[in-house]
Amino acid sequence: MIEPSVEEFPAENGPQLTPELAIANLQSSDLSLRYYAAWWLGKYRVKESAAVDALIAALEDEADRTELGGYPLRRNAARALGKLGNRKAVPGLINCLECPDFYVREAAAQSLEMLKDKTAAPALIKLLDGGVAQAVQVTGRPHLVQPYEAVLEALGAIGATDAIPLIQPFLEHPVSRVQCAAARAMYQLTQEPVYGELLVKVLAGNDLNLRRVALGDLGAIGYLAAAEAIANAKAENSFKLIALKGLLEHQMSAESNALSISDQAIRVMNLMDSLL
């Protein structure tokens, strides 16, 4: 049995909720209602204090378990808390990094990336213990021993420069997606173009899914030198537009005090127009 790591409740298949009802449902004895409520609160960005508190409490749920020992409600609660943007959730998410459920740890790392709280760095770094040599696949499972992609991306996003010596070896990890995550983090932490160029190189590869990953990474780090390579990549325009939008947002943020739009920003806009 492979446990899913993604949310499984399309809105049209679930009950109609209001924020108040969703918060109440998190206390329900019906596990399916609780699971859906956690997903719904994240999906619709319900940022009320009561919602945040209820989701934080759900991170410690023991009732909703899979046959393999997973914690589905905890997973959805962890994912939702990242979307709500409240740093009150950080301590609970840090605790989730020690959960025996891989997918809870992954969701917690992804949300800590969104929240960008530096206090999470030591706990995230701990998940890199053993380095590349220990970063192997779990026997009989579809994942590695730790959610390395999410951990590396989180460390990059929160600016954990102390982790650079631990992240760099993952550029040589045998799993290409982990290599991409390491390159993404290294660029964020050093701003050295060599790491951005590693991601650009992936765009020329034969694996479409990996090209999509690299597009997302380049957009996330705002590597402006990749603009043309992104526009010309062999991938769906929707992925390329999202990546270019990321570049543009980074550039506009850097130019927030400028009186006019730079030529570089205009260049990205023109590339986006060419894909529409």
Swiss-Prot record:
Pfam families: HEAT_2, HEAT_PBS
MF terms (GO), sorted A to Z: lyase activity; oxidoreductase activity
SMART domains documented for this protein: EZ_HEAT
Top EC class, one word: lyase
EC number of the protein: 4.-.-.-
Entry keyword set: Antenna complex, Lyase, Phycobilisome
Gene Ontology CC entries for this record: phycobilisome
Alphabetical list of InterPro entries matching this protein: ARM-like, ARM-type_fold, PBS_lyase_HEAT
Entry keyword annotation includes Ribosomal protein: no
Subunit structure: CpcE and CpcF associate to form a lyase.
PANTHER family associated with the record: PBS LYASE HEAT-LIKE PROTEIN, PHYCOCYANOBILIN LYASE SUBUNIT ALPHA
Functional note: Required for the chromophorylation of the CpcA gene product.
Stated family: Belongs to the CpcE/RpcE/PecE family.
Official protein name in the record: Phycocyanobilin lyase subunit alpha
